[in-house]
């Protein structure tokens, strides 16, 4: 099986002008895809920038994949989770110790809905590939 795409994961969706410079460097190194790691914070505070960054990547010929990163701390990441702050009773519980953990429980409808809404908003309101 041959490698069809070369990608770089990209964090920090705040400023389009910085992203463009980074994307140009990615292209110089042979990358054709950028994976945008999108956090809860990005969705809440930087959402208007996300699609502008997607468009700038497309203008440079890059394929764009959205990666919901650190959402509820369920999907990794050290970012602050607004879901966890607002839903303290919907956290994972250790099967061994009963300790409440600092990660959302995917078995709760509230977290599933929260995560699905983020994914749907990215699919509906951006031009990610």
Predicted segment positions?
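Aromatic-lined substrate-binding rim segments of carbohydrate-active enzymes
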Residues: 22-26, 35-88
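The substrate-binding groove and active-site-proximal loops of carbohydrate-active enzymes
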Residues: 6-14, 35-44, 97-117
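Substrate-binding groove of N-acetylhexosamine-processing glycoside hydrolases
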Residues: 2-9, 15-20, 61
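Active-site-adjacent "subsite" loops/lids of carbohydrate-active enzymes
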Residues: 54, 66-126
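Hydrophobic faces of well-ordered beta-strands that scaffold small-molecule active sites
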Residues: 4-10, 34-36, 64-68, 129
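Catalytic domains of carbohydrate-active enzymes, especially glycoside hydrolases
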Residues: 12-43, 125-129
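Amphipathic, non-transmembrane alpha-helical secondary structure
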Residues: 16-28, 47, 51, 55, ...
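Generic detector of short, locally flexible boundary/turn motifs and exposed helical patches
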Residues: 1-2, 29-31, 94-99
